[in-house]
């Protein structure tokens, strides 16, 4: 399980989209967003609602008017990009004229015991770690993670789990531990 303030994820069901044209296949996927009540099932209903348009060869621009922003549109948009790249024999970055470059990946530590959170943080090899917190053992959890990863840039995300008073209490303590940002 992966826990944040007020919610625990026990599975991630995914909508997979496959589009085919001229023996080329474009693929896209999305998990949806729980706080918008998106699920694989609801995204599938949305995707199927424009099946006719997809079969007639809808493009990315038209897609923006056919579906609202969300997981279904994202999965189809990714499949359209992938298909266009394969049909043209170019990469996405060549199609967009954006040079590829290295990016910093952020791994997230979900809410768990001090020991598990520290062990998960220690196992990450990324320079930035996002730590999910609720309103319990906040300082202790961050101290354990900082001890496990003294080299990491740490960002805290409490998902609206703190009051303003809690923020005022923890902010100076977290600053002393080198926390880069608190996301509320």
Question: What residue spans do the PLM features occupy?
Answer:
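Conserved functional loop/turn residues at catalytic and ligand-binding sites
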Residues: 178
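N-terminal capping/lid subdomain adjacent to the active-site entrance of alpha/beta enzymes
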Residues: 1-154, 161-168, 172-175
């Amino acid at each position: 399980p992966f826990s944040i303030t007020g919610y625990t994820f026990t599975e991630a069901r995914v909508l997979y989209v496959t589009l085919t044209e001229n023996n080329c296949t474009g693929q896209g996927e999305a998990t949806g967003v729980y706080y918008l009540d998106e699920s694989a099932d609801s995204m599938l209903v949305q995707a199927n609602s424009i099946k006719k348009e997809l079969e007639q060869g809808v493009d990315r621009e038209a897609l923006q008017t056919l579906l609202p922003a969300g997981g279904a549109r994202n999965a189809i948009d990714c499949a359209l990009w992938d298909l266009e790249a394969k049909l043209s024999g170019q990469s996405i970055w060549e199609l967009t004229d954006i040079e590829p470059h290295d990016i910093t990946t952020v791994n997230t530590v979900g809410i768990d015991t001090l020991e598990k959170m520290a062990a998960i943080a220690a196992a990450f090899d990324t320079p930035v770690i996002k730590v999910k917190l609720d309103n319990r053992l906040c300082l202790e959890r961050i101290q354990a993670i900082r001890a496990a990863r003294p080299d990491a840039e740490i960002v805290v995300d409490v998902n609206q789990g703190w009051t303003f008073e809690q923020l005022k209490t923890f902010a100076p303590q977290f600053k002393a531990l080198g926390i880069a940002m608190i996301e509320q």
